[in-house]
Amino acid sequence: MSPSLVSDTQKHERGSHGVKIKHFSPYIAVCVTTFSLAFCCFMVHGAITRQPTHLLPFFFIQVFDLIICLIHILGFMSSTSDIRLVIHTKTGPIYIKSTGLTFIILSISRMMLAFKAYCLGMVWDCYKYLMLNRRGNLLDDWYSDQWGHLSTFWSLLRTGRNRGNNSIGNSGSPNEPNTRPRPDTITYDPANDLPKYEDILKIPANAYTPPPYYCSNTNGNVNTTTTDAVTTNTTITSATTVNATTTITTNANTNTSTTTSVISPLTTTNKDDTQINNASSNAHSSC
């Protein structure tokens, strides 16, 4: 390379470097760094105090950073030839093919996107964990979901974050549901929380009157049922007695009527015989 070409290249580099310094503003970098640190501290405070809403600002910053990184990668991919030209115009020229340069840029960009997506997924998982704890749900309901609650491309990045450890250790298979019994709810026993002796002395003697006397509902129902049963039996007995008496009376009346009807013809026959005998006696007397 001729000395004139080297001097022109150095001048061009100095000029471009000077333009970059003119357009660079350190105040913007300081503001971005300050806000990033503030939101990071806010996220740590929310994770310690279990307040999920404090994690949202840092989460949105990560989403914005991921989008900006993706745009930068697309810009580098569209200007690969310019990068190759800059590399070849250095003092010590480096000869590299465009295919190799594209492969290097793609590898680095994929690693950056994967790392940013992994961090974003961790923040989202922490937010969902705190929300479920606030609602009173158990961790098993969260770990039983193998695909998570954020159905995007970074849900496939599960390296180092196996959510199914608890369910696999308990049930033996990640596809089997978790059948562990839930812990019993804690009940409050008022007998263990007794009042103080001084508070009891301050209560007047007639503050609580005794309740009125009453029979037990169970005994009352049993007695009522027994009384009803006895009454029913008595009614049935009375009805049976009345029916028997009526039947006997009817039979007696029937027998009496039959006897009367039988006696009446006999009496009539006897009267006729008496009249015949009297008539024959009168005839003999006349003779």
Swiss-Prot record:
Keywords: Cell membrane, Membrane, Receptor, Transmembrane, Transmembrane helix. The C-sensitive epimastigote form of the Colombiana strain is more susceptible to lysis than the Y strain at all human serum concentrations. Potential vaccine candidate molecule. The lineage of its organism: Eukaryota, Discoba, Euglenozoa, Kinetoplastea, Metakinetoplastina. Interacts (via N-terminal extracellular domain) with human C2a. The keyword Calcium does not apply. It is a multi-pass membrane protein. It comes from the Eukaryota. Cell surface receptor that binds to human complement C2a protein. This results in inhibition of the classical and lectin pathways of complement activation, probably due to interference with binding of C2a to C4b and interference with cleavage by C1 or MASP2 such that C3 convertase cannot be formed. This infers resistance to complement-mediated cell lysis, allowing parasite survival and infection. One of its GO terms (cellular component) is lysosomal membrane. Residues 49-55, 115-287 are cytoplasmic. Residues 165-190 are annotated as: Disordered. Residues 1-27, 77-91 are extracellular. It is found in: Cell membrane. The chain crosses the membrane at residues 28-48, 56-76, 92-114. This is Tetraspanning orphan receptor. Changing N192D: In strain: Colombiana.
